Design a protein with these regions (language model features):
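A short beta-strand-loop-beta hairpin characteristic of the jelly-roll/cupin
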Residues: 55-67
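Glycine- and acidic-residue-biased ligand/ion/polar-headgroup-sensing regions
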Residues: 34, 45-58, 73-75
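Cyclic-nucleotide recognition modules
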Residues: 70-126
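Well-ordered beta-strand positions
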Residues: 30, 48-49, 95
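Short loop/turn microsegments at loop-to-beta-strand junctions
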Residues: 26, 44-45
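Cyclic nucleotide-binding regulatory module and flanking cytosolic helices
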Residues: 1-35, 72, 78, 82-86, ...
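Short phosphate-coordinating micro-motif centered on Lys-Gly-acidic
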Residues: 37-42
């Protein structure tokens, strides 16, 4: 029985360790419900992690109508498209659906910590 528990507990401990390290490198901010966290068209230079709360990802169609693309919750990332696609500007608005605590890290800092410990990339990849 202890072997089974070890195979469960060890990966959880590793994930917690990587998350704690990742969050220690981030700037945390709180946003009231319905406030805008990201504006479409803004410079794309940061990755965000939802520590607490939920957000809505919104785009505009060709007629200017808002379309909800996703609801994201604690444990989810957003703002990653610019990290992987080299996009210069944000393609969507992200608004706090509820009161939120969000951790933000610049793409530059994220790449630095990923070079120092590539296992962080695997942790992040599992979350996306």
């Amino acid at each position: 029985m202890s072997r089974i528990m070890a195979t469960i507990v060890k990966p959880v401990e590793q994930k917690t360790k990587h998350l704690d390290y990742f969050l220690s490198q981030c700037h945390r901010r709180r946003y009231p419900a319905k406030s805008t966290i990201i504006y479409a068209g803004d410079k794309s230079d940061s990755l965000f992690y939802i520590v607490k709360g939920s957000v809505t990802v919104i785009i505009e169609d060709d007629d200017g109508r808002e379309m909800i693309m996703a609801y994201l919750n604690a444990g989810d990332f957003f703002g990653e498209m610019g990290l992987f696609d080299n996009m210069d500007s944000r393609s969507a608005w992200v608004k706090a659906k509820t009161e939120c605590e969000v951790a933000e890290i610049s793409y530059t800092k994220f790449r630095e910590i990923a070079q120092q410990d590539p296992r962080v990339l695997y942790f992040i990849g599992e979350q996306m």
